[in-house]
Structures are given as C-alpha cells and as structure tokens.
Amino acid sequence: MAGLSEIQATTWEYREKKPADAVADNIPLLFAMRKKGRVLTINGGRVIWEDIKYAQNNYVQRIDPTEEITLGYNQTITGFEYSPKIIVVPVVVNALEKAQNQGDAAFLDLLEQRNQVAEDSLMNNMETDLQGDGVGFGGKAFAGVQSYIVTNTTAGSYGGLARSAYSSIRNVAVNAPTTFTGSTDSSNIESRLRYSKNLVLRNGGPELCLAGATYYNAACDAMSAKQRFTQNQEMFEAGFDNVVIEGMTMVLAGGKSFSGGARIAADRCYGIRLENFALKMYKGFNFQPVPERVSVNQLVDISITVGIGQFTCNGAGLSFVMHDS
C-alpha cells in the first residue's frame, strides 16, 4: 500500500521497525572535516576572523662582522574577515499525531524519525554548500571549496583579500589538457596528480582529494591495474569508498544524491589541505535545536535546528584544483 502518511508509517503495527533510508546523501567533505577536527565552535563575534602570515620579512641580511644592520618593517600578517551564514530546518508535530503515536501502537517514535530526517536533510544541504562556491540561494549559502580553490587564481577575492594583491593566498590550478596532452584517464591521472600536488608540497601535501566521477573512476582503474589499490580504512569503515593515490585520500564527491544537491564537476578534483579550512559555528548554534516552541493558536509543537557560522579558509596556497574543462 503506497502513499502512507507519516503517522500511518510510524504507528501501524506488524511492520519492519526500521525505515529504509532514501534521504541521506553521500557527504564525504563534511565527514572529512569532522574527522580532522575542523568543525569548530566559536564564542560570539560580529564576524569570523582567520589570520595568515602572508609575506616574508624583507630584512633578512647577510653581514660582515662590523657591517651596519639595515632596520625596517614590512607587513607580514593580516586577516580574513567572513560574515556568518544561517541554515535552519524545522520539525512540526501536531497534537493528533502525538496522541496517535503513543503506547503500544508507537513502535517508532514519530518525532524522533522526523528529527532524523531533518538532520539528514540539513547535512545534505551543508555538503552541497561546502562543495559549492558560496553564491547559491541568493548569496545565503555557506562558502565552499570553490569559493577558495578556483581555476582563475588571480581573479576575485575571499575574506576581503584580493588574490591579485596577495600571491600567497592563491591556490594552484592545473588545466590538465593544456598543461599536458589530451584528456585525463587511468593511464595518466597518477602522474598528473603528482605534478599538481608537488606544486603545493610543504611538509606533506593535501591529504584529501575531492574528485568528480570521471577522475575518481580513472584513479581506481589506475591503482587496480598496478595492484596498488589501498584505502583510508577509517573513511571506508564509515561508508565512504575511497582510493589512496599520490598520498592523498581520493573520495567521490558525488554518488547518490537524494536531495538533488549539486556536486563538483565530473572531470575535476580538489586537493585540499584540511588544516587550512574550518567550519566555524557559533556556540549554541552548531546544528543544534533551539528551545522547542509551542504555537499559541495551533495544536502544534515546533522544533527548529539551527546552524550559524561559516566555512572559512586561512589561505588556499597549499591546495590545488586539477580540471579537464
């Protein structure tokens, strides 16, 4: 019997007591940020700051024993300024549903199930934002990797700093067919990734490679052919298929998207040094429910989960994008 209402699906007896999940998407970037400890809580503030040491001290000198030292100052430290964004998801239950979904008939808690769907829906949307460029939903979206790691590295700005003025905040962008010859496939993706990673190498390189389907499939084929297919066990056990290539954990950016949220293009990948990025959320609004509300003129209870913060970057100079188009 199709088309059951939520109250029917959660209250009727003699049913499988675990609903199938046709809501949760593949959310590899959000998972990786959490495991790296880059989802942080901040305590207030009008804006969110990230500091960066962006320039060399220009007064390093080699001198003779009696030579006069030239004294001077040049600015070496500055900051990025980010405006917070807000994302919410409401859950509503009315008095009739609460009355029906109780006692022996309530083998599934209706409110709990709705809250789980709401949480999954919220995380799906956050993954969409984190993989995006921050301009979606009329500019209300959180910033994403494409806000900071761009294909035109001298244009635009982020955090109030112009890429044209600060070369140290620019990521590396490699147009694969232009830099090399032909499209990227299993026969050449390893060497192309090595080239791209080496351009940003410093005490190790990017640890996460967020890849579109074409690049991800090519990497899997390349590693399988060489019998060198290894995986990040922690991500695999959490349900995120991956392949380790050139020292980076490459994960599929797309996969199944029940929400229909956009993901990065199939023929590109982002080499991300996670320590330079953070999802900074205000205390008390870290994807948490605010106090439950009761309508004054309706028999409904309302729970609203709120996230207020921003996806920030303290410099994309150690990350790269490689793309075929």
Task: Tell where the protein language model's regions lie, with residue ranges.
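Flexible, glycine/threonine- and acidic-rich loop/arm segments that mediate assembly and lattice contacts
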Residues: 1-325
